[in-house]
């Protein structure tokens, strides 16, 4: 199993939308590195759900329930989606500032490549963030 972080603008697609809609496709990714990360995802991989822009916090966990397929919103046929399902809301959101303050997380893509919307995490990084949320 691999671990990931997915970023979404809460005014476009929020944690509450994800919970309400149930399993749904993660669409609209238009960056090649993010697309390649989507292609690496496997069924049952876990992803943090990150609210970008105003909140800038990890708020929940989703699970990949369907591996990549063509993004139906992409007219160029270059981009893909995966389907994800909400698993758990974090007890306490973990903010970008908290992540930046943790020396063990200084090299994660959320800090180093802040514009990337789909990024891998190491198991150790995942575990640290889970502890921070409790």
Which ranges hold each PLM region?
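Compositionally biased, charged N-terminal/linker segments
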Residues: 1-42, 133-134
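Short, charged beta-turn/beta-strand-edge "cap" motif at the junction between a beta-strand
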Residues: 50-56
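Aromatic- and Lys/Arg-enriched surface recognition patch
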Residues: 60-119
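Charged phosphate-binding loop/patch that engages nucleotide di/tri-phosphates or the phosphate backbone
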Residues: 118-134
């Amino acid at each position: 199993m691999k671990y990931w972080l997915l970023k979404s603008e809460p005014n476009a697609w929020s944690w509450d939308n994800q919970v309400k809609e149930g399993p749904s496709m993660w669409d609209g990714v238009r960056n090649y590195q993010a697309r390649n990360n989507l292609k690496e995802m496997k069924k049952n991989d876990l992803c943090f759900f990150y609210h970008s822009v105003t909140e800038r916090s990890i708020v929940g966990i989703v699970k990949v329930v369907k591996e990549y397929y063509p993004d139906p919103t992409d007219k160029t046929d270059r981009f893909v989606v995966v389907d994800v399902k909400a698993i758990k809301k974090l007890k306490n959101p973990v903010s970008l500032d908290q992540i930046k303050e943790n020396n063990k997380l200084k090299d994660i893509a959320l800090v180093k490549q802040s514009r990337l919307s789909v990024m891998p995490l190491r198991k150790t990084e995942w575990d640290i963030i889970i502890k921070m949320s409790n």
